């Protein structure tokens, strides 16, 4: 008995599909398919509400059409088989299904075999095997086999197997097999297996296989196997396989296998396989396999495999495999070969030498190396094989100790020499 009932239901459903298909075909015939005329339709409706077959310009309910042409407003379920023509004024709301649903404004659920497009705005749940796009804004959940794009703003959850892009701003969760990009701002979670970037600012969690970049500021958690960069300021947690850089300031936790750099100031915890550098100040905890440098001031804990240097001053704890130097050095300094400056304060240690080149320079505190050479003034204690100072206010301990301004008999002394002249 149940089998007989099921067969009857299938038969009725098949008959209904046949009737709907026939009516849809007739609607296409009514419109002369390739040149549809506005207003030509077969309607079962009251006050433009009900069921329509054809190119009805204004309708509410269930509507079937071969191809939309000069449509004004449709609300409900709109099923079209062929891409629209001259339909930029149309406002379609509800469920739109077809090869390529098109209108001036599309809102609701839009399902297209190829995709869906709007001359102005596209909003809602939009699905297309190829692409989704709007001349102005795209808002909602947008999933396309190839790409999702908006001439102005793209907001929501967007996925494109190849690309996701917006002419102005991109906001939300944006995922792409190749690239995610915006001509203006990009805000949210943005993932492009090759790249993610914006012409202006980028804020949020951003991943690009080769690179993540912003023309202005880049803020948030940013990661790339290639590089992470910003034309102006870069702030947050940044991981770049090759490098991390900012045209102005770089702030946060930054790690890369190659280099980290900023045009102005670099602040935070910075880890680089090769080098760390800034045109202005470097402040924080910095580790580099080769070198660390700052155009002006270097402050904090700085550890480099080869060298640490600054155009003006180094302050804090500095450890270098070969050398460390700046015009002013303050704090605790250790160098494998040599350390130098014109004004050195604190504790300074080197296996090879410690040097003050300027006759008006000064070193104060504790210094220890094989050769301590102070052409200016030394205040404090020095330990070395050879200690040389132009002026001394303190004590030298070494094999040979030389103080230039001591009396002749006491200029050169073995083991110990001292002077406490003001």
Where do the model's predicted regions map?
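Intrinsically disordered, low-complexity regulatory regions of eukaryotic regulatory proteins
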Residues: 7, 32-33
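Bacterial N-terminal signal peptides
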Residues: 15-27
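N-terminal secretory signal peptides that target proteins for export/translocation
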Residues: 1-12
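Surface-exposed, glycine- and small/polar-enriched segments that build interaction surfaces at terminal
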Residues: 33-422
